[in-house]
């Protein structure tokens, strides 16, 4: 158990009640990391299935405050993956319909709702938060909010789920963090140890905290990689196809003002193929990187994929706010068909 004087004293400590509530995670990532979380306010934009997963994880982690922003109404399709919304809430605002269950997860967190369109928010609105996470947003909005966050030293995240596929992206600017490392000890040669005793050994019982720094690029640059260069062509073979799938789906969202839906499967599938060809042509890459059957696996939000991607995204937000452990720099892609995920660092060469 955390010592009483550590948690209830001055200097930004946490209460005994909070220490009991968060005892397990304090053991996991330490008291200082938990203090940073308890001082952080987070904005989540888009309360569909992925937004619900992120909100749930951050509320349970114990941030100071969380604001759920969404100007859209609950649709019957939302009920398939959005567990914070009650069945009879169709037609209500998505954020408002999520509030009761979200707050009940952890009364110690100040959970708020905002029903205004994100595009109408002034820059000053975002400065109220330590981290901003966008879902269900257009490419233009993602780029605009990322730029606002960068100017104001706010940690920026975005992510989405499209059928079996999902992604996350982070721009933390110049981010400092600490990482726990096992100490390397030099063991002197002894009679019982033999000649190998001179080699350096890892002593798992002793660890040290190492400070590190990493630099992130804006999402605009990450989505505008020039694939024409020699180095880029070599990297192209190692790049996850999901990066290019994301480009196609963001273009679809921009053109149609929505994501592909099963209600108009044939029409949307045909349009996705056309957008794939147009996007790949503009990027200067072959459409063969994304075979035609991709259209079968990117419709609607799937609850299991939301759970995985939402868990990863919330974990990255916690790591960034607590300044503990290396963050994903900068994309994470999840392929539900393969049951695997990959971290990709994409941006200026």
Curated annotation (Swiss-Prot):
Family: Belongs to the ubiquitin-activating E1 family.
Gene: Sae1
Modified residues (N-acetylvaline): 2
The UniProt record lists the keyword Membrane: no
Disulfide bridge positions per record: none
Database matches in InterPro entries: ThiF/MoeB/HesA, ThiF_NAD_FAD-bd, Ubiquitin-activating_enz, UBQ/SUMO-activ_enz_E1-like
Domain of life, per lineage: Eukaryota
Positions carrying Phosphoserine: 15
GO CC field: cytoplasm; nucleoplasm; SUMO activating enzyme complex
Pfam families: ThiF
Assembly description: Heterodimer of SAE1 and UBA2/SAE2. The heterodimer corresponds to the two domains that are encoded on a single polypeptide chain in ubiquitin-activating enzyme E1. Interacts with UBE2I.
Name listed for the protein in its UniProt record: SUMO-activating enzyme subunit 1
Pathway: Protein modification; protein sumoylation
Keywords: Acetylation, Ligase, Nucleus, Phosphoprotein, Ubl conjugation pathway
Modified residues (N6-acetyllysine): 201
Tagged with keyword Acetylation: yes
Residues bearing the modification N-acetylmethionine: 1
Organism: Rattus norvegicus
Job description of the protein: The heterodimer acts as an E1 ligase for SUMO1, SUMO2, SUMO3, and probably SUMO4. It mediates ATP-dependent activation of SUMO proteins followed by formation of a thioester bond between a SUMO protein and a conserved active site cysteine residue on UBA2/SAE2.
């Amino acid at each position: 158990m955390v010592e009483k004087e550590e948690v209830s004293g001055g200097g930004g400590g946490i209460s005994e009640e909070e220490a009991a509530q968060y005892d397990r995670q304090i053991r996991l990532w330490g008291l200082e990391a938990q203090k940073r979380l308890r001082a952080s306010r987070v904005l989540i934009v888009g309360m569909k299935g992925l937004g619900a997963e992120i909100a749930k994880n951050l509320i349970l982690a114990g941030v100071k405050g969380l604001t759920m922003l969404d100007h859209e109404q609950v649709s019957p399709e939302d009920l398939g993956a959005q567990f914070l919304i009650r069945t009879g809430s169709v037609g209500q605002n998505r954020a408002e319909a999520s509030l009761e269950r979200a707050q009940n997860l952890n009364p110690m967190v100040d959970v708020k709702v905002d029903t205004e369109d994100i595009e109408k928010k002034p820059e000053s609105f975002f400065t109220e938060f330590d981290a901003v996470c966008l879902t269900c947003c257009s490419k233009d909005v993602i780029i605009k909010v990322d730029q606002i966050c960068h100017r104001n030293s706010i940690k920026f995240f975005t992510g989405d789920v499209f059928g079996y596929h999902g992604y996350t992206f982070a721009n933390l600017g110049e981010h400092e963090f600490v990482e726990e490392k096992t100490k390397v000890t030099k063991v002197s040669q002894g009679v019982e140890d033999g000649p190998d005793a001179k080699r350096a050994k890892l002593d798992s019982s002793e660890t040290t905290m190492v400070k590190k720094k990493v630099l992130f690029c804006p999402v605009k640059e990450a989505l505008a990689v020039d694939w024409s260069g020699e180095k880029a062509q070599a990297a192209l073979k190692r790049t996850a196809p999901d990066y290019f799938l994301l480009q196609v789906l963001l273009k679809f969202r921009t053109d149609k003002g929505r994501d592909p839906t099963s209600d108009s499967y044939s029409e949307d599938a045909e349009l996705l193929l056309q957008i794939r060809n147009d996007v790949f042509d503009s990027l200067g890459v072959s459409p063969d990187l994304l075979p035609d059957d991709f259209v079968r696996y990117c419709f609607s939000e799937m609850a299991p994929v939301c759970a995985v991607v939402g868990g990863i995204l919330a974990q990255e937000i916690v790591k960034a706010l607590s300044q503990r452990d290396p963050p994903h720099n900068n994309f994470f892609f999840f392929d539900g068909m393969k049951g695997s995920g990959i971290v990709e660092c994409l941006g200026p060469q």
